Amino acid sequence: MGCANSHGHSELKITKPAPEEGVTHCGPWLKHPEDIKDYPKFPAEYSKSLLCKALTKDVWEACKGRKDAAGVSFETCILSGCQNVDSGIGCYAGSHDSYTTFAPLFDKIMEMYHKHGTTAKHVSCMDASQLNCPPLPEDEAAMIVSTRIRVGRNLADYPLGPGISDAQRIEVMTRVTKAFENYTGDLAGQFYALNKLSKKEKDQLIADHFLFK
């Protein structure tokens, strides 16, 4: 069917259709957001992504050509899914504001993926004693060699992946490292910049299951 390239995207063997008035044929030949000039049309055999299901002509007309508060265009948000037509979801928010500016699309996708609508209320509880996590039976617990929990967060007022610039990435790293310097006790730790790791540090982090090959 295809294989993954160095960026993790699949390389499908599909033929670019002949031009068709009023639509942009989706596929790996799309390289830039500006290439999506008209309503995206997905190959019939690759129409299972949430983007394909949610991106009706009405949604396209409501969002096309618009930009969110960070300056990220709607076409930028959907480019990956239009390029990689076998995607599961197929879109990326360019900033926190994308969810508001492009709500006609993102609301539908979140409802399909998370199974709740825009009226649902998120309830936060930071009391660990309220967690319903009974101990595992001894035979099951014995099979666990190590566990790893990854927590990802985004800084307010910065674009997300598709919209952030190299300069902003450096700014985020600078702010985060300065904040880490003030952490003590259980929050204390070590910050590692991937582009500055020595081989010894890299090997040790891999051995400790913090860094993956």
PLM-predicted stretches and their roles:
Residues 2-213:
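Long, Pro/Ser/Thr-rich low-complexity/intrinsically disordered regulatory tracts in eukaryotic proteins
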